[in-house]
Swiss-Prot record:
EC assignment: 7.-.-.-
Topology of this chain in the membrane: Multi-pass membrane protein
Function summary: Performs an essential function in the generation of cytoplasmic iron-sulfur proteins by mediating the ATP-dependent export of Fe/S cluster precursors synthesized by NFS1 and other mitochondrial proteins. Hydrolyzes ATP. Binds glutathione and may function by transporting a glutathione-conjugated iron-sulfur compound.
Transit peptide: 1-23
Name assigned to this protein: Iron-sulfur clusters transporter ATM1, mitochondrial
Native organism: Gibberella zeae (strain ATCC MYA-4620 / CBS 123657 / FGSC 9075 / NRRL 31084 / PH-1)
Family, similarity comment: Belongs to the ABC transporter superfamily. ABCB family. Heavy Metal importer (TC 3.A.1.210) subfamily.
Keyword Oxidoreductase: no
Family annotation (Gene3D superfamilies): ABC transporter type 1, transmembrane domain, P-loop containing nucleotide triphosphate hydrolases
Amino acid sequence: MIPQLLQRSSRACPRYNPALYRLSTTSQQRPGLTQTFWTSAPRREQPRTPTDSKPTTTKPSAVFPANKKATKQNDPLVTVEKSAPEQRKADWAIMKEMTRYLWPKDDWGTKLRVSLAVSLLIGAKVLNVQVPFYFKSIVDSMNIDVAAVGGTATTVAGAMILAYGASRIGATVFQELRNAVFASVAQNAIRKVACNVFDHLLRLDLTFHLSKQTGGLTRALDRGTKGISFILSSMVFHVLPTALEISMVCGILTYNYGAKFAALTVLTMVSYTAFTIWTTAWRTKFRRQANAADNKASTVAVDSLINYEAVKYFNNEKFEVARYDKALGQYEKNSIKVATSLALLNSGQNIIFSSALTGMMYLAANGVAEGTLTVGDLVMVNQLVFQLSVPLNFLGSVYRELRQSLLDMETLFNLQKVNANIKEKAGAKPLVLSKGGEIKFENVNFAYHPNRPILRDLSLTIPAGKKVAVVGPSGCGKSTLLRLLFRSYDVQGGRVLIDDQDIRDVDLESLRRSIGVVPQDTPLFNDTVEHNIRYGSINATHEEVVAVAKRAHVHNTIQSFPDGYETKVGERGLMISGGEKQRLAVSRILLKDPPLLFFDEATSALDTHTEQALMMNINSILRERGRTSVFVAHRLRTIFDSDLIIVLKEGHVAEMGTHRELIDRDGVYAELWSAQETMFGEDGKEKSEEENDEQKKN
């Protein structure tokens, strides 16, 4: 009995032992609950096998799609084949959306620039059409024996030559001025659309971002923004002006040279346009497939580079290169189809135009032979037809590029159409902490997948201003509590309250501003140490940054860096250690200074000495400011002094109380504590099986 009391006393009054913080290598020998609990290594919640009791779930599909087909249909980055009417409807919707940026309601500066650009464009087209007339006059004027009449080129055709040159120069000047005037309109639209999409992406919930790969997303954004400028310029400078120029040329040919020229011109226009539209529509699927392959290749490359260390640790460079080569091979295959179909389109367009040009020249030459037309008329017809070739070829290429840009922008606008599962109620009021930050989970049910519930009718209360620990085996729902509290996900049954306010009824920004999180896997930006700390409060001064760094016991470490607080931490903070990253995360949260704090294995990467000093500082801050704090922990030594310890098991509360109460209860927590307490000897070495058996006998 006495040895048992001594052992019970030891569990209730823990002694500091550095060996207790080492990673256990014998955990696999421990059955049941203790098997998954003794490591402080990075963990993921694995949903447990469902039992007979199933919680009521309201919208499980909002968290995890029911099937792959639904996922593909709802993914804005996935290529979905459309019928011709559906594609036209989508294209017109994009064009309509772009008119908002081309002709904004209250932006008179943009309207003025667009109007001026259109005026310059019309002027350029009118001057272009004048050029063949002047050329005809020059040829007819020179089609005499100039020496016989005692004249010179200047006296015979000087005025026409000057007019010819002035028209060409004027058309070029007007066209370049038009480009300069319109540049600000296009760039402003690109900026607005890109910012709108980026803002929308940041507002989407965690479900969307966990299911998307960064490489494909950034590639789609890049292509879409590049297409904006072309679509805007096409709407203003290509489609309508080209149609205007074609109409003017056709009208001149008809008026000056009769019905035969008119009929041939109309036939050419109809054939050329129909062939271009049909062939381009047929080519669209190849371009869409090439875009999808491009997204995949970009995703593979970014994913491999982000996880560079994992690639090196497992010597999988060849495997990653093979993956990338496979993705590029698919892109190559689809790009060849695009290039081949483009060659077919260009060939067909040239055949149609060359046939029309041949017919026109025959009719004009026949008119000269009959004496009804002059040589100047022959030249003018040739010039007009060639002048017609420019807008025709341009219209063909514009249509091709327009289709490409519309496809790219379709993905961009599809991203804007993605609805967030987490929505703020209309008229939601800011969160008011009238009780100091009391948190309640009432009959909460939640599952990431409909068939794998995580929380089952969970009810618990976290008192205001207290330090509360949440412990339990991996997959029991500890980190899920934070995600629900932060509204990264919504509960599927029950409710979450903060000071008696349902978090679904309060303003999202005020809710998230009131919660501070120190995650186990600390997210850092590829920027300076100071920037990463200041991210907790963007307007903080350098002195405030240094102050919180000192409280987090990381100031001296930062001072030892090559550039101190200006040292770059690298991609995702990979240039500093895990412990340094966690202390920067603690500094960041101290700078934010929210009323509710959540620490998710926040010291798992620290050595015991630093961890102990840091926890003393954190505890003093919590007591001093009366903050409500929640600590998720596997190592019970770090949370035994909590005001309340909540033990989760299989999605519900197994027991709760103080450390001493739970030890006296001799339940799940006592089993966990005993396993960790007895795993190491006083010398810091793992106990042998004989030593453990001897202790059990006592």
